[in-house]
Amino acid sequence: RKSYRIPFTAIPLTRNGTIGFQVENAMAATATGWALGLDWSVIEKALAGFINDASTAPGRFNVFDYKGATLIADYGHNPDAMQALVQAVDGMKSIRRSVVISGAGDRRDDDIRQQTEILGQAFDDAILYQDACQRGREDGEVVALLREGLKHAKRTKRIDEITGEFKAIDLALERLQPGDLCLILIDQVEEALAHITRRIAETA
């Protein structure tokens, strides 16, 4: 039986195999193509062309460079997503890590807390923001739950609370130094990505 191999270096989506959930996505796509009887060269070409940016997959681990720092924008809003994001970030070099996060008000209290419990083990700074739609929660309620989740954080030492998604993003960008990494968990996907793109353009 023939066997075929494609190195992760040939699949940009996986960032050389360091992004676990993208490796899984690539494997699933490969299996689907193979099951459909596609020629291996077609599958290989498709994997090489997978692009995961703000225009093709908005809010899905979009990576940017900002003054020599790495920005990641993602629409993750649950503990499983946080775990996957932390695993991905662990495979990326950085001097200091920061995270910008809000929470969906229609989630359970424990689910909101668990997000920052996970992030608190992996990031040095956390900026908590109240997003545009509280989804039935009182003002400040979601941010308070996020802060509770950081109560026993092993790594996060600096915590800020901000009202407004763009203000939170701007604060994070102001603090970034070359070699840092910032994970921005966006709420208003298109608007937030446009804001980040504008801020990056201002540095050009």
Describe the predicted segments one by one:
Residues 22:
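Conserved phosphate-binding catalytic cores of ATP/NTP-utilizing and phosphoryl-transfer enzymes
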Residues 12-19, 28-41, 45-204:
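ATP-dependent carboxylate-amine ligase
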Residues 1-9:
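Acidic-glycine-rich active-site phosphate/pyrophosphate-binding loop
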